[in-house]
């Protein structure tokens, strides 16, 4: 564990995790990435460089569908790279959308993944195309700096374009926070953009992070009540916008949320952010920096499984962390203001804003691609070519075609009709509120399918909903291929976390508003057991629910599952 005032340690404790030594000796995230990229013998890079590459917004992966066959043929794995593009608040111009579409066609697997943190993600990029892909992203005035790694990740905010003035201000704050907390190293520009090299990197400084950066990843998001679409309680720092008389006055602050855990290690668990107070809006960037530096100085650097800020808050106590924050700020944060969330989903379809329109398109699991009967990618390209507003990537992996002028609305609607694009109203409430991570075949951590499987599982659950008369009922359902929690499954009313191919832990009892953790209901079950478990529950819910009662609330009231008050009780 590191606890120093200057946060840049020349001699690291020998008990620290090996990643701390790698970061400290990486020459501010350069490592030998350039040499690895230049090696023509392999499609991979060294393991150390692969770890550092995450700070540049890319993961080395391989096609797990081909692993066994390539092993039999004595070939190395089918290596490729994922790039995650930093898009603060998920706001992109039509020109940027076209550029992302071009990159996906030229260098990736002809698809774009809209992530649960409002970023673009490309898969299947070969090593020889990695640098040009990065350059093309930069030409679009975007980047992948700090989209991954032990730093602040893409800062989220509510898309909310129909409240134009408040949203613009909130999106500006998301961008300011994201830019302020970027690493200052010149490594990204040197490696990917042929920037001028720093001759003496010993003079280089990381004024916020230091040369070992953070113990683990760090996530910040801004919610705008009544919508909790960013799942504010899942964030390391959650900011809840307080709006009075259509004016943003400040933010309530939550600390120490996080979704990830490790199967079989009960010392790891998901946790909700704790509400600690209210801050005026002009102080938000400084407050985020000071909270981040508390994690920098007191986070666990010996055990990465317990290194997230949620464990720091649990170990030191939210009162101590708040007092330390006040000390670093030089002033005291105030008591939290009143607010109320109603849901954590998206408002789909056309919504009228101030002098404009906004269309929220349902995109199942955020995968933008063309199929034989649904040319989604082609349609969005056509829209981008005529659109004069912008696009907003939603935290639920949907897409807002935003700020459509009244003059353009009919033209865009014609493209929507031509390609039969859906706002989700032809789907069940369950499917509209579904979310899945990538998992197989590219994610190296996946233990089971997720994105490729959840749609077909939902189809079978929909038969149960039809039997129960619940097809229009809004129920959140999420699936991940491993317990890292990328689709924020621990907040869903129904969730599945992969244990092995075809096997999942099933969780129930999350809140429709994203304010409560769920709890394990069945362990290591297959599809038949999933359906057999859900059928009686859905039938009971249909017959015995109270007026307006959501499924997650019902299973707790009915005694099916115990309510989780704190992440530390998640496994008990």
Curated annotation (Swiss-Prot):
Which EC main class describes this enzyme? oxidoreductase
**GO biological process terms held by the UniProt record:** cysteine biosynthetic process; hydrogen sulfide biosynthetic process; sulfate assimilation
Alphabetic keyword roster: 4Fe-4S, Amino-acid biosynthesis, Cysteine biosynthesis, Heme, Iron, Iron-sulfur, Metal-binding, NADP, Oxidoreductase
User: Which residues does [4Fe-4S] cluster bind?
Assistant: 437, 443, 482, 486
| Gene Ontology CC annotations of this record | sulfite reductase complex (NADPH)
EC numbers listed for it are: 1.8.1.2
Q: What cofactors are annotated for this protein?
A: siroheme; [4Fe-4S] cluster
Q: Does the keyword Cell wall biogenesis/degradation apply?
A: no
Tell me which positions the record assigns to the signal sequence. Answer: none
- Reactions it catalyzes: hydrogen sulfide + 3 NADP(+) + 3 H2O = sulfite + 3 NADPH + 4 H(+)
GO MF: 4 iron, 4 sulfur cluster binding; heme binding; metal ion binding; NADP binding; sulfite reductase (ferredoxin) activity; sulfite reductase (NADPH) activity
InterPro entries associated with the record? CysI, NiRdtase/SiRdtase_haem-b_fer, Nit/Sulf_reduc_fer-like_dom_sf, NO2/SO3_Rdtase_4Fe4S_dom, NO2/SO3_Rdtase_4Fe4S_prot, NO2/SO3_Rdtase_4Fe4S_sf, NO2/SO3_Rdtase_FeS/sirohaem_BS
Q: Which Pfam families match?
A: NIR_SIR (PF01077), NIR_SIR_ferr (PF03460)
Co-factor binding details: Binds 1 siroheme per subunit.
The residues listed in the UniProt record as binding siroheme, with positions renumbered to this chain, are: 486
The annotated pathway is:
Sulfur metabolism; hydrogen sulfide biosynthesis; hydrogen sulfide from sulfite (NADPH route): step 1/1
- Would you identify the family this protein belongs to, as annotated? Belongs to the nitrite and sulfite reductase 4Fe-4S domain family.
Q: Which HAMAP family match?
A: CysI
NCBIfam families in the record: CysI, PRK13504.1
Q: What does this protein do?
A: Component of the sulfite reductase complex that catalyzes the 6-electron reduction of sulfite to sulfide. This is one of several activities required for the biosynthesis of L-cysteine from sulfate.
| Record text on subunit structure and interactions | Alpha(8)-beta(8). The alpha component is a flavoprotein, the beta component is a hemoprotein.
Protein's recorded name:
Sulfite reductase [NADPH] hemoprotein beta-component
Native source organism of the sequence: Staphylococcus epidermidis (strain ATCC 35984 / DSM 28319 / BCRC 17069 / CCUG 31568 / BM 3577 / RP62A)
